Amino acid sequence: MKTPLTEAVAAADSQGRFLSNTEVQAASGRFNRAKASLEAAKGLTAKADSLVSSATQAVYTKFPYTTQMEGPNYSATSEGKAKCSRDIGYYLRMITYCLVAGGTGPMDDYLIAGLDEINRTFELSPSWYVEALKHIQSNHGLSGDAATEANSYINYAINALT
């Protein structure tokens, strides 16, 4: 899994050199933000069930057809609703992993790679997940640096979907 820190170390090592001042300063900046990132990860994790539940409801409100259409890709059944919640929870989990890792590596490796193919294959609309993520962003209850850190990864996920 790549993070800005592991990439800097790998680049320096492959070139047989020590980290440059710029790379060390970047690492220092990351460590300064680490406390806020961990606070955000803890906050999102503590509220994960309620955030996923309310984000799922936000999707159903904005896209009511998702609960009216029959089929395995919609939420007309309890099984479909469970799948929707599971998928939204997966996005939120990836965001918390990124917060802990200090970079987009977890999301890049485990979510974004193949995202278009999955959505096409299962006829899933990215707009559903964008709505869910926007709802989470507006309702996570974080503030200050923790909110800034969380929102940066939420925005990254939203941009990957659009």
Swiss-Prot record:
The keyword Phosphoprotein does not apply. Light-harvesting photosynthetic bile pigment-protein from the phycobiliprotein complex. (2R,3E)-phycoerythrobilin binds at residue 84. It is found in: Cellular thylakoid membrane. It is a peripheral membrane protein. GO terms for biological process: photosynthesis. InterPro entries: Globin-like_sf (IPR009050), Phycobilisome_asu/bsu (IPR012128), Phycobilisome_asu/bsu_sf (IPR038719), Phycocyanin_a (IPR006246). Heterodimer of an alpha and a beta chain. GO terms for cellular component: phycobilisome; plasma membrane-derived thylakoid membrane. Contains one covalently linked bilin chromophore. Belongs to the phycobiliprotein family. CDD domains: PC-PEC_alpha (cd14770). This is R-phycocyanin-2 subunit alpha. Keywords: Antenna complex, Bile pigment, Chromophore, Electron transport, Membrane, Photosynthesis, Phycobilisome, Thylakoid, Transport. It comes from the Bacteria.
